[in-house]
Amino acid sequence: MSVKGITPQELAAYGIHNVSEIVYNPSYDLLFEEETKPTLEGYERGTLTTTGAIAVDTGIFTGRSPKDKYIVRDAITQDTVWWADQGKGKNDNKPLSQEIWNHLKGLVTEQLSGKRLFVVDTFCGANADTRLQVRFITEVAWQAHFVKNMFIRPSDEELARFEPDFIVMNGAKCTNPQWKEQGLNSENFVAFNLTERMQLIGGTWYGGEMKKGMFSMMNYLLPLKGIASMHCSANVGEKGDVAIFFGLSGTGKTTLSTDPKRKLIGDDEHGWDDDGVFNFEGGCYAKTIKLSEEAEPDIYHAIKRDALLENVVVLADGTVDFNDGSKTENTRVSYPIYHIDNIVKPVSKAGHATKVIFLTADAFGVLPPVSRLTANQTQYHFLSGFTAKLAGTERGVTEPTPTFSACFGAAFLSLHPTQYAEVLVKRMQAVGAQAYLVNTGWNGTGKRISIKDTRAIIDAILNGEIDKAETFTLPIFDLAVPMALPGVNPDILDPRDTYADKAQWQEKAEDLAKRFATNFDKYTDTPAGAALVSAGPKI
């Protein structure tokens, strides 16, 4: 079956004219040639490294630009989007008028017109019933490479009948000179129009804007259909038992979901529908700062031909210095998921989840290493999305910094957070799934809970041992904590026992409880949020 490709007339329908050539769904070999052409300049040019992967730079934008994110406010989105200018919660969903959208679209289409363009047709979502068919249009070869890595690659048969549901036009080279008069944040923009089903990118070269842009759109579309949309990793055991892992950066989400006894469904973005849990993506976007073969062999070995490195330091001989964070600490690599051996094949999906794990790294030394949550506590801790970091390594500086990120991914939520919590718990209740709060952080000893103990805790959750254990109730937080677990140091299960003076735990617990309550206040502007206050800590 022949792949139909795309015509200049189709691009003209988006406002792109006089295209000199269309490179449609290029192969990896062609992309390799295109992005290493000696005539390329600036951020377009890729560098071949000794790993076999190409390295590119994204300029001053080495991460997402949340302050430059906009959504057109119209009849469709007015009463559904969680707007930045409404309610108590802070978020990045700033409203944009149709008039300014038209102006931004004109800038991007003018930038892409008359050029040689790469068009990549992909799927977002591994379940054929609910996936988005996404068309990416860019003039930059490595950006086409990035989306080929990160999204699901259709077969020739699927491409022959491909009809896009969503268009992403990446005009990284263009900026908006009228931003001040229009009341925008800067000359750069990442804008969405849910009526036109389109994303526009201008001014930023960061590849992650395309990945997370479509995640934000799935986060809008799926929950409205009753499908959970989740910022999590997921894996499946030999018996088909599925576990999902939520957690902010530094909590161990990638490490703990990578398990030789279980197959990886995906590492970052998933949906949960009537058939089960499915990956949105066809690749992984892993951090590479201080990467080593010993610590993370799967990621290390995935960096080879067809992988794409971002903002790493490449030495004169082509070797990569993964320890050098001089460009950014957010160095990344994208690669197709099949670069990892132990994955679910041929489609990144599995059955319903039976275990839901919330990972937190509590630097306050208050939370137990593991607790079993009720349905309301599940919603409360999901909405809280808590973790904490130690403030610094200087002597005597021990005040932790708390982070609360709704649904463990506030930056990507398009609807009010309570809608995600409600859908998740409905999915869990339909199949009898159980949630657990796992603390990978610190306790009263001042040391971090060992990876050995944490892995044994995860094993006890996955094999069901934790559900047989006797529990006690931890005061203030009202959490059900096991009294003993196989392979876990019994002295750490009650966090109070890790303090020489238990009054210290009480004092810290009351402090942390107040922080939880202060954070949760923003959800009380909806009936669903107000009803969950009693599931939180009590002072």
From Swiss-Prot:
Q: Which residues bind Mn(2+)?
A: K212, H231, D268
Q: Copy the pathway line from the protein's UniProt record.
A: Carbohydrate biosynthesis; gluconeogenesis
Keyword list, A-Z: ATP-binding, Cytoplasm, Decarboxylase, Gluconeogenesis, Lyase, Manganese, Metal-binding, Nucleotide-binding
* Chemical reaction(s) catalysed: oxaloacetate + ATP = phosphoenolpyruvate + ADP + CO2
Q: Which residues bind substrate?
A: R64, Y206, K212, R332
GO biological process, any = gluconeogenesis
Description of how the protein assembles with itself and partners: Monomer.
**Protein name (Swiss-Prot/TrEMBL):** Phosphoenolpyruvate carboxykinase (ATP)
Instruction: Please tell me the species this chain comes from.
Output: Yersinia pestis
Gene for this protein? pckA
